[in-house]
Structures are given as structure tokens and as C-alpha cells.
């Protein structure tokens, strides 16, 4: 009987890809098969996020719950950014944990599972960081890491501490992985990096210098890959050359995530973001002039230390002007190893929560308005999933919108045109042409 693996993944797309990496390693090298029931698992992995405090606090209650439910001989491993941050503290607080594996060490999973109380949390570079996973949870889409770590020093962000110095993956390895994925039937690749468009600034050893824009051009030449996406770019590095390539390259999906964080130039300066409200708006206007169909998503933090009502209204102003399609928004959470952690001018919790509610409520209205405008429009959709119980196929447009259509397995993996006939906040309903 094969060994069973259960994995819980929290946080960003980087964590999702790290989990895919560990699953593929354990399936190929250790004979594990995936289960969605922790009670039958021989190995339970919790791949953690530490961007905010709440998920970190919740980790230990989850460990306690898994410890009660698991088979007596089953092991629990804590992986990811909280593992990098807390290290051996996890073993002290949760004796039922067998090992701790940091975000930069996921390639060591096959070795660590055989060690009792191992702690692997180094954030320095080693060649194993470039190992690509051999599996994906989707037959038609795949994620590829093109850089590891982050060199930015945003005042609120713990990621440079948990994921280490930024290193670019050599382009020949990325292109080789893209060709392998294409040969396996993958149609769409999502390129991953903490500051993905900062790619090419540093390699581990002697490699040809290549920029992110040049990498996009080369990847678009890979036969079989029909769509390219990437996350998350930094607004500061969205130069005109990049924007022109984004707009003119037909394989680059016209959907982009531009983390704003705040619409106040004063708060952006305190955050150490390196740009102003004016710069951000300028980049959006330039992008829309080149590719008006582009949809834009963002991240926003409300209640950053010192944020006034006027500062918050600056954020609301940008929301109105840009009309973001997707919004990931949170109340500021102080994190250790960050500049802002020691600041005392915190915003009252009730005030911050009320601002978050206003922001999210207005965004919901904007999203409904944007989606209603899609009725009657024609889009090309890559069909990714089938909801057999409901008879629907699901996929995404080039602009990143979720579409449902009545249909069977014959659509899966194909890109077909549809006309949008109904619109809801979370998805659109299409009909084939």
C-alpha cells in the first residue's frame, strides 16, 4: 500500500508552486500519493504564510488539530515562510512537529522527512533552488519560478527575511522548463517572482544578462505555449520598453497585477515603495493607452502607521481612477524584522477596519459595474476545469476573467471564442460561437 500525503497550502502563488514541487518530489522519489483527508495521511505538510500575523498565530491551533486527528505514526512537517521565520521555535511550541523546512529549502523535502526534529531554514543560495517541479495540479496551466527572494526593503514586509536575497533563475533553465511543459500539453505559463519584473539583476554565477522584457520575448517563441502571465511585478520597474512589449506581444495575457499598497504619496514614502501616487497613475495611463483592454489588479494595506483620513482618501481616489478588477486588501499587520514593526503611531483598530470595509464595499460595486459591461462581448477562453455535477466548464479569458459555459470534456485544454451572455461579480456566463 502506498504512503499517503496531505498538504495544506496557505498564502501566495509562490507557496502554491512550492507545494507542487514538494508533492512531485515525494510522489516520484518516496512513493507518496496525495490525499485530501489528513486522518489517513502518513505525512502532513503545512505550507505556511507569514505576511500577516493572524495566519502565523493560527498555525499552532492547526498543528494541534492535526495532531489529534492523525494516525499515531504519521509525521507533521511545517514548511514555508513561517518556518523560515520561526525555525526551531516551532518545535519548542509544538512537540508533535517532526521537522521544519523553510521557504528556500523545499527541494530538500525528500531528505528531511527521514530526519527527526530537523530544521532547514537557510536563506542563502544553493543550486537546488533551481530545481523545477516535475508535476502540476493542472494539465493545461503551470507555474514557473523565474526568481527567488527579494531585495526590496518595504517597511512592512517580512518576505526578504523569510525568502532571502533575490536571485534570478538562468534563462536557459526557464526556457528549457517551458519547452518541457509545452511538450506535456501545457498551454499557459504563469511566471513567478516576488518582484517578477526585476528579473535579470543578479544571477548566482556567470550567465548571459537578460532582462524580464527579453525573457518574455524568448518565452513567446516556445512552440505550444499560447499564453504568458506573471506575478507580481513592481510598479517601479514598469518602464516603457516593458509596457510596449506587454501591449504588443499577443501571447502575453492582457491582465496585470500592480501592487499599489497605498494611494497616498506620503504613506508610500513611509512604506519605502519608491514611487508616488502620480508615478503609479502615470504607469496605468501609459499601459491603458497601449492596451486599453487590460485588466488591472492590486494589493492595498489600510491602517499603515500614521495613515490619516486624507491619506486613505488618496487610496480611494486611485481605486476610482484605475477601477481595479481584483483587490487583495488587508489591515496593516506589524511583522518582526521589518522597519515599521517598532513604529508607535498605529492607527486605531476600529478606524482601520472601517476603512477596509469602505474600500472593499466600493470595490465590489466597481467589479459588478465592470462585469456588467462584458455582456455581449466576445472573449477567447482557455477551458481548465469541468464541474461534472453541474455540467459546466470553467476557464479564463485573456484578461483574467472567470467564465462558465455549458459543456463537456471536449472543451478542456482548448482556447475557444465565447460570447458573454450573463455577468455576476465572481464570474461570467458564456455561450460558444
UniProtKB/Swiss-Prot annotation:
It comes from the Bacteria. [4Fe-4S] cluster 2 binds at residues 150, 154, 157. It comes from Wolinella succinogenes (strain ATCC 29543 / DSM 1740 / CCUG 13145 / JCM 31913 / LMG 7466 / NCTC 11488 / FDC 602W) (Vibrio succinogenes). Keywords: 4Fe-4S, Cytoplasm, Iron, Iron-sulfur, Metal-binding, S-adenosyl-L-methionine, Transferase, tRNA processing. Coiled coil: none annotated. Residues 136-369 form the Radical SAM core domain. One of its GO terms (cellular component) is cytosol. It holds the Pfam family UPF0004. [4Fe-4S] cluster 1 binds at residues 12, 49, 81. Monomer. The keyword Membrane does not apply. The gene is miaB. This is tRNA-2-methylthio-N(6)-dimethylallyladenosine synthase. Binds 2 [4Fe-4S] clusters. One cluster is coordinated with 3 cysteines and an exchangeable S-adenosyl-L-methionine. Catalyzes the methylthiolation of N6-(dimethylallyl)adenosine (i(6)A), leading to the formation of 2-methylthio-N6-(dimethylallyl)adenosine (ms(2)i(6)A) at position 37 in tRNAs that read codons beginning with uridine. PROSITE patterns: MTTASE_N, MTTASE_RADICAL, RADICAL_SAM, TRAM. Its cofactor is [4Fe-4S] cluster. Residues 372-433 form the TRAM domain. Belongs to the methylthiotransferase family. MiaB subfamily. It is found in: Cytoplasm. Its EC number is 2.8.4.3. CDD domains: Radical_SAM. GO terms for molecular function: 4 iron, 4 sulfur cluster binding; metal ion binding; N6-isopentenyladenosine methylthiotransferase activity. The keyword Transmembrane does not apply. Residues 3-118 form the MTTase N-terminal domain. It catalyses: N(6)-dimethylallyladenosine(37) in tRNA + (sulfur carrier)-SH + AH2 + 2 S-adenosyl-L-methionine = 2-methylsulfanyl-N(6)-dimethylallyladenosine(37) in tRNA + (sulfur carrier)-H + 5'-deoxyadenosine + L-methionine + A + S-adenosyl-L-homocysteine + 2 H(+).
Amino acid at each position: 500500500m502506498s504512503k499517503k500525503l496531505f498538504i495544506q497550502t496557505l498564502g501566495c502563488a509562490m507557496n502554491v508552486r512550492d507545494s507542487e514541487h514538494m508533492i512531485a518530489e515525494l510522489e516520484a522519489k518516496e512513493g507518496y500519493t496525495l490525499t485530501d483527508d489528513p486522518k489517513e495521511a502518513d505525512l502532513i505538510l503545512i505550507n505556511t504564510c507569514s505576511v500577516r500575523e493572524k495566519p502565523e498565530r493560527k498555525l499552532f491551533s492547526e498543528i494541534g488539530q492535526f495532531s489529534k486527528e492523525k494516525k499515531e505514526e504519521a509525521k507533521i512537517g511545517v514548511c514555508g515562510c513561517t518556518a523560515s521565520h520561526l525555525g526551531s521555535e516551532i518545535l519548542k511550541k509544538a512537540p508533535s512537529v517532526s521537522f521544519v523546512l523553510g521557504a528556500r529549502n523545499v527541494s530538500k523535502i525528500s531528505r528531511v522527512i527521514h530526519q527527526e526534529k530537523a530544521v532547514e531554514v537557510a536563506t542563502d543560495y544553493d543550486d537546488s533552488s533551481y530545481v523545477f517541479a516535475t508535476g502540476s495540479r493542472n494539465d493545461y496551466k503551470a507555474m514557473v519560478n523565474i526568481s527567488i527572494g527579494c531585495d526590496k526593503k518595504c517597511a512592512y514586509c517580512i518576505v526578504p527575511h523569510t525568502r532571502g536575497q533575490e536571485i534570478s533563475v538562468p534563462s536557459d533553465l526557464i526556457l528549457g522548463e517551458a519547452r518541457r511543459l509545452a511538450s506535456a500539453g501545457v498551454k499557459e505559463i504563469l511566471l513567478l517572482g516576488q518582484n517578477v519584473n526585476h528579473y535579470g539583476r543578479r544571477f548566482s554565477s556567470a550567465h548571459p544578462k537578460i532582462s524580464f522584457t527579453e525573457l518574455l520575448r524568448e518565452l513567446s517563441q516556445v512552440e505550444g505555449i499560447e499564453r504568458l502571465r506573471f506575478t507580481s511585478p513592481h510598479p517601479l520597474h514598469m518602464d516603457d520598453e516593458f509596457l510596449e512589449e506587454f501591449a504588443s506581444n499577443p501571447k502575453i495575457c492582457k491582465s496585470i497585477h500592480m501592487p499599489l499598497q497605498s494611494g497616498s504619496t506620503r504613506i508610500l514614502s513611509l512604506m519605502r515603495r519608491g514611487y508616488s501616487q502620480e508615478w503609479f497613475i502615470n504607469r496605468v495611463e501609459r499601459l491603458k493607452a497601449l492596451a486599453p483592454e487590460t485588466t488591472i489588479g492590486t494589493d492595498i494595506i489600510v491602517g499603515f502607521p500614521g495613515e490619516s483620513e486624507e491619506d486613505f482618501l488618496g487610496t480611494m481616489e486611485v481605486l476610482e481612477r484605475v477601477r481595479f478588477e481584483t483587490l487583495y486588501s488587508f489591515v496593516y499587520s506589524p511583522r518582526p524584522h521589518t522597519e515599521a514593526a517598532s513604529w508607535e503611531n498605529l492607527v486605531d483598530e476600529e478606524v482601520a477596519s472601517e476603512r477596509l470595509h469602505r474600500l472593499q464595499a466600493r470595490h465590489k460595486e466597481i467589479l459588478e459595474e465592470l462585469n456588467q459591461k462584458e455582456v455581449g462581448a466576445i472573449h477567447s477562453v482557455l477551458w481548465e476545469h469541468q464541474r461534472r455535477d453541474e455540467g459546466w466548464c470553467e476557464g479564463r479569458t485573456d484578461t483574467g476573467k472567470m467564465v462558465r459555459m455549458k459543456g463537456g470534456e471536449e472543451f478542456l485544454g482548448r482556447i475557444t471564442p465565447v460570447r458573454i451572455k450573463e455577468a455576476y461579480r465572481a464570474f461570467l456566463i458564456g455561450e460558444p460561437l
